[in-house]
A protein has these predicted regions:
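Fe(II)/2-oxoglutarate oxygenase catalytic core
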Residues: 1-72, 80-110
Length: 110
């Protein structure tokens, strides 16, 4: 089943490419600063397979997801879903990340 959000409730997505040994490996959440307080959900799509590290870990859930090309993960942006990426020492990792908001971001931007 598919779903859609009205135009404006989704921010443009970002593509991040991490070389071996790189990554966003600090615990963080996707909401909290003034610029991000309207975020409700984050999605992340893995754009390649990573077999040596590269997992996404969620602190309070005690869960992790192995990168598999085409897999999309969706979770709340709040501190309840604090997460981090595990660095792969030997492989690159490419992801697309985006956010769905409580408010129409076009109205916020003015």
């Amino acid at each position: 089943k598919t779903f859609s959000f009205p135009l404006g409730y989704a921010e443009p997505f970002n593509i991040q490419h991490y070389k071996p040994g790189e990554g966003f490996f600090s615990w963080h959440c996707e909401r909290g600063m003034h610029q991000t307080h309207q975020r409700a959900l984050v999605f992340m799509t893995y754009l390649n397979d990573v077999t040596d590290g590269g997992e996404t870990q969620w602190l309070y859930q005690g869960k992790e997801m192995k990168p598999k090309k085409g897999l999309t993960v969706l979770w709340p942006t709040d501190f309840t879903h604090t997460h981090k990426g595990v660095v792969s020492p030997t492989q690159s990792k490419t992801i697309a990340t985006g956010w769905y908001n409580y408010l129409d971001v076009r109205a916020i931007a003015g």
